[in-house]
Regions:
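Glycine-rich tight-turn/loop motif centered on a GG-T
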Residues: 23-29, 71, 104-118, 160-173
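Active-site beta->alpha loop and helix N-cap motifs at the rims of alpha/beta catalytic domains
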Residues: 79-114
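Short beta-strand segments at enzyme active-site cores
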Residues: 46-51, 97-98, 133-137, 155-158
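A structural motif corresponding to the C-terminal end of an alpha-helix
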Residues: 42-45, 121-133
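Non-cysteine beta-strand/loop elements that form the S-adenosyl-L-methionine
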Residues: 10-16, 93-103, 152-160
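N-terminal small/glycine-rich loop or linker at the start of catalytic domains
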Residues: 8-24, 102, 106-109, 120, ...
């Protein structure tokens, strides 16, 4: 699995929650770019954001501004929805992390289903545009092997199960 270790990132900062606050306030405060700049000044060597299909937090203008103004690589998390992938190919972030998306989820609750129809085509399309591809996957040897076969540049492991284990072990379930 050495092939996944090509780039070393020390601090990647997800700035989505800046947009969550902005949308809750229904004004342009806090400003997404000011948050991005603060993260970079603080040492971030990657900025991550998630363009959801429903645009509930981050929107297309945010992504354009982030890509155009960031001096560090931008990782854009997204679904494999065709409209979203068209946008990603047009604005070409450094990396696209493909994630599952269900509108009813508050946050992503699991990894991408690697047998999803069209996934390999999306990966190839992004790579042909010069965009590095990452997959957000559940932690299993099988998923890691499949990701390797798909020749993605890196993977991100969903660790929700591990994060929630204490509550599961100490609940009355």
């Amino acid at each position: 699995y050495q092939k996944f270790l090509g780039e070393i990132m020390l601090l990647g900062v997800n700035i989505d929650h800046i947009a969550v606050l902005r949308e809750a306030r229904q004004v342009n405060d806090p400003d997404i770019l000011m948050g991005m700049y603060a993260a970079i000044i603080g040492g971030a060597d990657q900025i991550t954001t998630h363009l959801r299909e429903d645009r509930r937090h981050i929107n297309e203008n945010d992504v354009k501004d982030i890509i155009n103004h960031s001096r560090v690589p931008v990782n854009l998390e997204c679904s494999i929805n065709e409209e979203i992938i068209d946008f990603v190919c047009k604005f070409r972030p450094h990396r696209a992390t493909l994630v599952p998306e269900k509108r009813e989820e508050l946050t992503t609750e699991g990894g991408l289903n690697l047998s999803t129809a069209g996934l390999e085509n999306v990966i190839n399309r992004l790579k042909n545009e010069g965009i590095k591809v990452s997959l957000f996957i559940d932690t299993s040897r099988e998923n890691i092997d499949i990701a390797s076969e798909l020749a993605v540049d890196c993977i991100e492991l969903h660790t929700g199960t591990y994060a929630n284990i204490f509550n599961m072990l100490n609940s009355n379930i």
